Amino acid sequence: MEDLQPINPNTDSPTETGATTIEARFSDFCKGRLTMDDNALEEAMKLFNQSKHLFMTNASALGSGTPEEAEHYWFAFILFSMKRLSKKNDGEDAAKSSENSFKLYQILRVAKLNFVDFFKELPQFIVKTGPILSNLYGSDWETRLQAKELQANFVHLSLLSKFYKRAFKTLFKATHENVEGQSAVANSADYISNCHRFGWMLFLALRVHAFSRFKDLVTCTNGLVSILAILIIHIPARFRNFSMSDSSRFVKKDDKVVDLLASLCNMYETSEDELRKTVVRTNIVVEEILKKDPSMASECTNGNLDNIDTDDLTYFQDLLEEQSLSSDLDVLEKDYDDAMLLEGELDERLFINDEESLLGSSSLSGGAINMTGTKRKVDSMTSPTKTITSPLSPYKSPSKMISTPVSTAMTTAKWLRTVVSPLSSFPSVDLTRFLQSCDKDVTSDVIKRARIILEAIFPSSGIPDRTIISNTQTTNLMDNIWAEQRRLEALKLYYRVLHAMCKAESQILHGNNLTSLLTNERFHRCMLACSAELVLATHKTVTMLFPAVLERTGITAFDLSKVIESFIRHEEPLPRELRRHLNSLEERLLESMVWEKGSSMYNSLTIARPNLSNEINRLGLLADPMPSLDAIALQCNMSCGGLPPVPKRDTSPGKSGEIRSPKRVCNEYRSVLVERNSFTSPVKDRLLGINNLKSKILSPALQSAFASPTRPHPTRGETCGETAVNLFFSKIVKLAAVRINGMVERMQLTQQIRERVYCLFQQILGQRTSLFFNRHIDQIILCCFYGVAKISQLSLTFKEIIFNYRKQPHCKPQVFRAVFVDDRSSSRRSKTGQDHVDIIMFYNEVFIPSVKPLLVELAPSNVPKNPNNQVSDSNKKDESGPCPCPGSPKVSSFPSLPDMSPKKVSAVHNVYVSPLRSTKMDALISHGSKSYYACVGESTHAYQSPSKDLTAINNRLNGTRKVRGSLNFDEVDVGLVSDSLVTQSLYLQNGQNGKGPSSSSGQELKTE
């Protein structure tokens, strides 16, 4: 296809020029710029016309809100959807399609958009046009669209390209220092630049021909490291940025020659076995595509191989020679062009070309947009921790100094490889004892179930005909090997955590008979799904993104939410990154997924809240019966040869996208350090006042959590469904409290406003629960803020609330741009006809009519409690003044959320560690004293809790090194801090006069 030029940006407003002009511009975009044929144009125009009314009502919400940019976004969305969903299967139509094909990167180039902004705005288009796309392309349209997979692939390539650039720059010089003359220097620079491009193009060829479906981040990193090995032994030694005699960097074999692959494994945390296998695959790609003759490196006398152990290395005589490098690049370019014709929306060469205008400079993270209000690089945005170092910090090796998403993934994979992989693939002796102690021996049932479920999650390709030698056969074989390895890892992790849970459960129940739990089908599937999700998260696959494990195991988000906390608690050495992943999943489940149609939470809710049954049934929210094991096995067998079809539940109502936000972890009796990004902490759990410490320590047995909702709870005098719903609601309230507090701090509102918003949210959850159905909890929180502001006569507009919400780490635009409303309700029949509206329309038409009586009760004492008093009409400008303080102080209803939540990390000494926010940490801890603190998320060793570093810190404090100033650490036990001191320093009392240690000071601690 010829190079495409941008369209003329001089367009008029869609509301001014009318639909006909918009259609003409869209036709010119398609036919004039993308050279589409008449058939493709007709199909694109059909989708455009059916969605045109949605564009008219939502144009101002797209991008920056300018008419021309909004049109460009909508054109790109329409063409992307049409192309992805209208692919033909028969040969003739496929041939026509290839002749008339256009790629997403070409659409964006014409529209003057970039990938980051495109993926940022795409979710709200999907939510708005979902019913239209379903009618035109079938109910499985979202699965075939693969928008999340494309976004994850883009993020991975961004990370991999930066990893490759950093590694190449570290290993090789930009020019050779000993050359003389300007032309020689230029030629030298061109050669290194071409070598750099050659490495990336060879990596793309490896992805196309060797990695097939499972292009996970760990496998791709192994591929890049294998290419670095090939570059090292083929690029002339004079361009190296290192010396083979550098003993600190390289692993020596027999104290003489360097083991190159082992050295690279040490540098980049790769598996040596996997790297050696990947090097073999890379050599095959070089041999077959570039037609190079391989020879054993041990038989070559090239100077590049000096001081290198040449055993098992392959050398290509003319590879990367200046005379042939240009032609080799042309061959790789042609090979990639051929692959792009068949499949691919993203030209992966863009990452080596540094086309910032097309790639974008904002950040995408983990398949979800990270809305921070500032533009930062992808690698720094997705980096899980901020590394803090100082001259006094404990020693860290150079490879650990910089934490990036790639290095974190490789470290996590190393944990899976070294801790989990050596375990047995069968239940241990102790676990078998629990399985045999049930009313009947369930060992065989557990083994059979695990095999079926894990084969459904990690399916094998069809067995190819051994008489046919083809690239497909090779990739299918590697797919099967990859899937089998992941199945084994998930299986071993499942047995390991299951045994730990059984042991803990037996202590709670004072017996080994766990029949109710170990015969519960739903519990085992949740455990298998959790184990598989951790394996997938470790390898960071593109093709299996959450919630795929839910769909393939037949469970729901509510089911999985019951085991996540227990899973984390009973797998002590779980790396921090995987803890964060599970915590973020739990938060996604709580904030929206559990409220979606088809959630088993509604089945429990009909038992716990019978008055909601009619509304739940009217909206069709109940979950379908869980598919049997036989049905899953049959589906997996029928799908052999490809990924099993993922049945998408009808979740279009209320679908609000994936929100990233602070994470939630543990309970009070866990002896693990809470991460700084947790959305609650052990101390916060206590201060929330939802459950006392005793009820937490004596937590309900897991078998009660997975029992039938109608079954009476053995100890609580209520049904198991009521217990499950109450526990779930308590988690929702905790999450809402932290998010409300974050918004209050950002907007600098008073404690009274915070308490009223929190109380209103609690009352809505308890008394107007149906407002949460098919919605996101942030939508309710935002409406609570505005309603409380109106009733408190506070000058705060919805625009200001949304402006500040967009700065929150968990924000996504579709939360306030697409709120579900029930078109079948009588109050909506004469409205716009949309089932998703903006949050202001939702507030006026749905929220206020339902919540007004609750709001009126929260009005300050000096405000008349008139039911019609200023709680609606959110489109009007707020002109009221600030709310005076109530006449008399009262005990705060809002849970205390101190900035520095102390965690007791020693059973012997009163030693606390506080997870400071980064802003507080930078302000309170000077550069010279950072080594005295264990900062949450920081550690001197891989996948180790930072609390383990306290011993090293105390040893430094108790050492003989003199400290500047007049302090004498030899006369006090600096490792001990009294409980009362911590309590006096850190607890917020929120108006509880005389009831706490801080009351004597008379001064209130200010939150950040």
Swiss-Prot record:
GO terms for molecular function: RNA polymerase II transcription regulatory region sequence-specific DNA binding. Residues 606-722 are annotated as: Spacer. Residues 375-394, 865-899, 988-1008 are annotated as: Disordered. InterPro entries: Cyclin-like_sf (IPR036915), RB_A (IPR002720), RB_B (IPR002719), RB_fam (IPR028309), RB_N (IPR024599). One of its GO terms (biological process) is cell differentiation. Pfam families: DUF3452, RB_A, RB_B. This is Retinoblastoma-related protein. It comes from Pilosella officinarum (Mouse-ear hawkweed).
